[in-house]
C-alpha cells in the first residue's frame, strides 16, 4: 500500500468485485432455499386432495412448513377450515 493511497481514502470497487459480491449473495440465498426437501410441494398437494374428500377447501388453505431444531425436524401443518 502506497502512502498516498492511504490519504486518498478507499478506492472505488471494480465492477468485477461488485459482481463477485452479488453472486456470492445469490449463491448463499439459493443454498438456504435448498435446505427444504423436494417432497414438500407434493406433500402439500396430496394433503389438499385428501382433505377435499371431506371438506371444501382451496389450495391456499393448507400451509406446510419444515423446521430443523438441532437433530430434530418438525413438520408444521396449518389448515384453514371453512365455517359451517
UniProtKB/Swiss-Prot annotation:
The keyword Cell cycle applies. InterPro entries: MinE (IPR005527), MinE_sf (IPR036707). Transmembrane segments: none annotated. The keyword Amino-acid biosynthesis does not apply. Belongs to the MinE family. HAMAP family: MinE (MF_00262). Prevents the cell division inhibition by proteins MinC and MinD at internal division sites while permitting inhibition at polar sites. This ensures cell division at the proper site by restricting the formation of a division septum at the midpoint of the long axis of the cell. This is Cell division topological specificity factor. The lineage of its organism: Bacteria, Pseudomonadati, Pseudomonadota, Gammaproteobacteria, Pseudomonadales. The gene is minE.
Amino acid at each position: 500500500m502506497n502512502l498516498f493511497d492511504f490519504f486518498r481514502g478507499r478506492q472505488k470497487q471494480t465492477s468485477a468485485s461488485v459482481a463477485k459480491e452479488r453472486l456470492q449473495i445469490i449463491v448463499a440465498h439459493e443454498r438456504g432455499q435448498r435446505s427444504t426437501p423436494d417432497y414438500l410441494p407434493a406433500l402439500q398437494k396430496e394433503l389438499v386432495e385428501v382433505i377435499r374428500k371431506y371438506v371444501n377447501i382451496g389450495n391456499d388453505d393448507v400451509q406446510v412448513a419444515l423446521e430443523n431444531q438441532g437433530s430434530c425436524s418438525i413438520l408444521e401443518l396449518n389448515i384453514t377450515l371453512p365455517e359451517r
